[in-house]
Curated annotation (Swiss-Prot):
PROSITE patterns named in the record: ALANINE_RACEMASE
GO biological process: D-alanine biosynthetic process
Residues forming the catalytic site: K34, Y248
Co-factor requirement: pyridoxal 5'-phosphate
Record's keyword annotation contains Oxidoreductase: no
One GO term describing the cellular component: cytosol
Binding site for substrate: R126, M296
Record-listed N6-(pyridoxal phosphate)lysine modification sites: K34
Keywords, in A-Z order: Isomerase, Pyridoxal phosphate
Gene3D superfamilies: Alanine racemase (3.20.20.10), Lyase, Ornithine Decarboxylase, Chain A, domain 1 (2.40.37.10)
EC identifiers of the protein: 5.1.1.1
Record-stated family: Belongs to the alanine racemase family.
UniProt protein name: Alanine racemase
Gene transcribed to yield this protein: alr
Length: 352
């Protein structure tokens, strides 16, 4: 059975973005594939990324994600960015997953065959050890022969004021300087685009930027192409007569006799319900409004004057004039939330 909505995932666009970001950073990449690869499909993106020479490894947020990627046997290291539970440490180490460490207790608990990445809190106040303590932990990991990397996370590199980002970088470098050589990584996508070359780091971790998106003031730094195009199937074409209402609540009434196409994509699939009465889609390359309230499984589009039939495809977002950024704006949210909220009913399809 075919899906009513599907996401085309462009390997060419992904590789284009990865090449540009790696060149800008002056490092190889540790590509975040957490949250189902930002909604793009974990296995699909992991396989596409592993084929790119600038990708050193793949970063995940949960032990289950780490296990899933490790079992693909792609020949790229898998780095877990958030703490596992004590009973998960050995099974993950057995799979070769690189483990985060932010306390002496965690450092001592690692098996001898583990590879650790020291987590340093330079100001995000989310995870990690503060710099002074991180140095002690890192030195102990080095003594045990399990220290491979060290990392931190920038809090403000998407902003125009980079003063705090520079302070975080200074703090992180003070830790790195006190340790034996490690694979250091700190730059997210915003960090790569705003701070530029960080060749003293071994790796960079561009998330959303790898999938084609950047803050407005940074969009010209590295040309990026959205990796995903979202298409949905027309399930019915019918008439609404002048004055009739469409969808729940009667929020929209037809100003004239109107041809409507119902498409199989709704808020259960990830289309923001808050985009009601603002959203548009592309029908045969032409922008057409989504009318009435967006439903759980479908929505209705004004296609008056166009030749449309059941089974046709419409584009809900892509790499052209109608992007996820615009959809997120209609939904009063951000690209991250739209992409990671894309439901499992939406089939991910690899394209060249």
């Amino acid at each position: 059975m075919q899906s009513r909505a599907y996401a085309l995932i462009s390997e060419a666009a992904l590789h284009h973005n990865l090449s540009g970001l790696s060149a800008r950073a002056g490092t190889r990449l540790l590509l975040p594939v957490k949250a189902n690869a930002y909604g793009h499909g974990l296995e699909l993106i992991a396989r596409q990324a592993a084929a790119h020479p600038d990708v050193w490894g793949l970063a995940v947020a949960t032990p289950r994600e780490a296990q899933a990627v490790a079992l693909l046997n792609l020949g790229r290291p898998v780095v877990l960015l958030t703490p596992p539970t004590p009973d998960e440490v050995v099974p993950l180490a057995d799979l070769g997953v690189r483990l985060p460490v932010s306390s002496l207790e965690e450092a001592e608990a690692l098996p001898v065959h583990a590879r650790a990445h020291l987590k340093v809190d330079t100001g995000m106040n989310r995870l990690g050890a503060r710099p002074d303590e991180a140095i002690r932990i890192g030195q102990r990991l080095a003594e045990r022969g399990v220290l491979e990397g060290a990392y931190t996370h920038f809090a403000t590199t998407d902003e125009e004021d980079l003063s705090f980002a520079h302070e975080q970088l200074r703090r992180f470098r003070s830790v790195i300087a006190a340790l034996p050589p490690v694979l250091a990584h700190c730059a997210n996508g915003g960090g790569i685009l705003s701070l530029g070359h960080l060749g003293d780091m071994g790796l960079s971790r561009p998330g959303l930027a790898s999938y084609g998106f950047a803050p407005a003031h940074l969009q010209r730094v590295v040309p990026l192409t959205p990796v995903m195009t979202l298409r949905a199937t027309v399930t019915q074409v019918h008439k609404a007569f002048a004055g009739e209402s469409v969808s729940y609540g009667g929020l929209w009434q037809a100003p004239r006799d109107t041809t409507l196409a119902t498409i199989g994509f709704g808020y259960a699939d990830g289309y923001p319900r808050n985009a009601t009465l603002r959203a548009h889609v592309l029908v045969r390359g032409e922008r057409r409004p989504v009318v009435g309230r967006i439903c759980m499984d479908q929505c209705m589009v004004d296609v008056t004057g166009l030749e449309v039939r059941a089974g046709d495809q419409v584009e809900c977002w892509g790499s052209g004039d109608l992007t996820v950024s615009e959809v997120a704006g209609w939904g009063d949210t951000i690209e991250y939330e739209v992409l990671t909220g894309l439901g499992e009913r939406v089939e991910r399809v690899a394209v060249p």
